[in-house]
């Protein structure tokens, strides 16, 4: 708290020329400073950029898909070369909101050994030790006046749903695509059992 000195000014009908008067200086001994609280909002878009699959891709922004019915969740299936590095960013430009290894919670469910590219730097790039296709999920949550980020690093799994698999809408390994081992390989669909929508 700090002291604040004020004076009151009065006039007639708001006219500065009619009966203008000023009070003595008044000392308010303890005034608490106030700053309006800013509430953060969930990002509407999410991108990743980095040295995947080529080292010169830091100026290219890969947009993650918003998850249907899950505000603040974004995902994509991405190929990373060995020791590729990347960052997460709600902007498709370097605007100061990018997140590095120490600025988000890491949930690596792949054994790919995600590490910091520079342990001494909180905002360092996220490094993927093992090459392969991965499902990248970025979860965001409002925490007061900031947004918390969680990076879920999952195996790349793609499934066939709809009429073409007989109308089954359950997760079933019989309807899982074969994931390629290389960047340019094909995701191979299981055999379709019927005609119709996918």
Predicted stretch roles:
Residues 1-198:
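Insoluble glucan recognition modules
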